[in-house]
Amino acid sequence: ADGDRRQPQARAVVSAGVAAVARAGLAACGASLPLVLAAVLLAGCGSTSKRGAYYQGDGPPDRIPADLAEAPDAVPRVEPLHPRANRPYTALGRSYTPLTADAPFRQKGAASWYGRQFHGNRTASGEIYDMFAMTAAHPTLPIPSYARVTNLRNGRSVIVRVNDRGPFKDGRIIDLSYGAAVRLGVAAAGTGEVEVERLTN
């Protein structure tokens, strides 16, 4: 739900680095380009103005399921790591090394969310983004993996499946699906302070 959100991949990951950079910079421009070209043109797309808590073209769906606030958590299970989405990559000049060891992980910071502009497009895992599913994007948690996200203001929590990369804006630590943001009570504000706890890879 913010302008660092990325151009969705047109196909399975060409490389984690190129995909992350392309998605990070071109979403607000409405571009639909091959990933390599998108990365080259990234520098020209940084001036889109905000409208509310998200950038022009993104936001909540026109129709919200009546029971979305009661949607069930993602169910953690052990899955093989994606062969390409867990490689080191660079996005917006910063290098990231995804975590691949099965080790505890906790992090506090701001959560944002992404919505209708990306609904139906591919994530870094190659899966189709469903804005109503309990999923999330994280810069370094394994893809796929599961995490409990807790709203530090109201105590609500949700279990999400990490299947995408981002956010790449300072202070943001996780990009939630719209459904997960509704569950946590941060959809209206656009962001909220949360704690992320890894559950399993």
List each language-model region with its residue ranges.
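Secreted/periplasmic proteins
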Residues: 45-201
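Intrinsic-disorder-associated, low-complexity terminal segments enriched in Asp/Asn/His/Tyr and depleted
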Residues: 2-4
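Low-complexity, intrinsically disordered or signal/transmembrane-proximal segments
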Residues: 7-9
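Sec-dependent bacterial lipoprotein signal peptides
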Residues: 14-43
